[in-house]
């Protein structure tokens, strides 16, 4: 019953999300440290963190990197990655969020799972009820029953590290009203279980209705919200430069046509231009490098085409060579 209402394609390691965006090595380290310190209770303010920024700023890459880190370290977490460009319709369905989080918590917490299973047997119609009712019956009330000692025993963690719940791409849920409703429900749940070590990391664009909900809900006013705006990240340009250097190094080391490359290509001037044109939208740099690194083409010619695109911002996206890389994503970004 529970699994049938989940969005399995929205999980951090789902097959549908093969090769998801993530932070390149040695990039966004300060942002990641701030998030990890907040999760680990070294930063005491906020039960909820809002990671925001414009399209392509790197929100999903950071969320994916944090989620994978928790998985690798066997630290309990649950996640949901919305996506409007996914082939899976479940990844834009806001009604799938709560069951999917509950499902993951059931895998982590044996006693919690028993409580949830009993509730589902008693009321198999629970997923036909409101999202508020689902969250109260299957999330808030069961977790309120746990003492702190019992909670940490359940998550099998010797250190008091909170349970992390990640919701990425909330703005890509298909219905803006549902987006706001889910935010309100998360805020109410966070307030109800504030004595439990649980953190909610929400990543989204700063859409007006989402910003308004964060600004107006009383829970977020009472020192329970922490914000990170990637558009204001002073390290964005350095992170993009580090990424570009790493990717061009790979081309020099392994591209089929690497022996035709100038050993000093590209120049620092070109790297600086790419950083200037990309920052703070990391996705432009990553899309450009996918295009340039194509094994069937000459990288220097591809870079020249990219530079031509970046210097003709008024040209239609259909004429831009970058559109051949991840075409649906590219068109989605540049035709907004």
Task: State what each model feature region is.
Residues 1-336:
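Conserved NB-ARC/NACHT P-loop NTPase core of NLR-like innate immune receptors
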């Amino acid at each position: 019953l529970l699994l049938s209402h989940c969005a399995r394609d929205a999980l951090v390691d789902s097959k549908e999300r093969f090769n998801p965006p993530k932070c390149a090595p040695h990039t966004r380290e300060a942002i990641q440290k701030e998030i990890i310190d907040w999760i680990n209770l070294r930063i005491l303010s906020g039960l909820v963190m809002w990671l925001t920024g414009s399209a392509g700023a790197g929100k999903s890459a950071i969320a994916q990197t944090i989620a994978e880190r928790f998985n690798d370290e066997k630290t309990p977490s649950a996640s949901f990655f919305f996506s409007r460009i996914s082939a899976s319709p479940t990844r834009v369905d806001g009604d799938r969020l709560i069951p999917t989080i509950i499902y993951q918590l059931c895998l982590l917490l044996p006693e919690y799972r028993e409580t949830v299973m009993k509730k589902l047997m008693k009321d198999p119609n629970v997923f036909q009820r409101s999202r508020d009712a689902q969250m109260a019956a299957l999330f808030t009330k069961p977790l309120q029953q746990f003492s702190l000692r019992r909670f940490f025993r359940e998550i099998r963690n010797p250190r008091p590290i909170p349970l992390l719940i990640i919701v990425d791409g909330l703005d890509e849920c298909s219905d803006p009203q549902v987006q706001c409703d889910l935010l309100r429900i998360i805020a109410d749940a966070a307030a109800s279980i504030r004595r439990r070590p649980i953190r909610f990391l929400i990543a989204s664009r700063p859409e007006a209705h989402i910003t308004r909900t964060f600004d107006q809900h009383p829970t977020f006013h009472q020192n329970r919200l922490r914000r990170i705006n990637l558009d204001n990240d002073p390290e964005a340009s350095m992170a993009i430069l580090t990424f570009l250097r790493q990717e061009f190094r790979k081309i020099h080391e392994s591209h089929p046509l690497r022996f035709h490359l100038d050993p000093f290509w590209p120049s620092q001037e070109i790297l600086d231009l790419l950083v200037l044109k990309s920052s703070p939208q990391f996705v432009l740099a990553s899309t450009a490098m996918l295009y340039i690194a194509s094994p069937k083409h000459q990288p220097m010619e591809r870079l020249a085409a990219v530079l031509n695109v970046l210097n003709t911002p008024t040209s239609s996206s259909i004429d831009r060579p970058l559109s051949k890389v991840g075409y649906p994503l590219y068109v989605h970004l540049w035709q907004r």
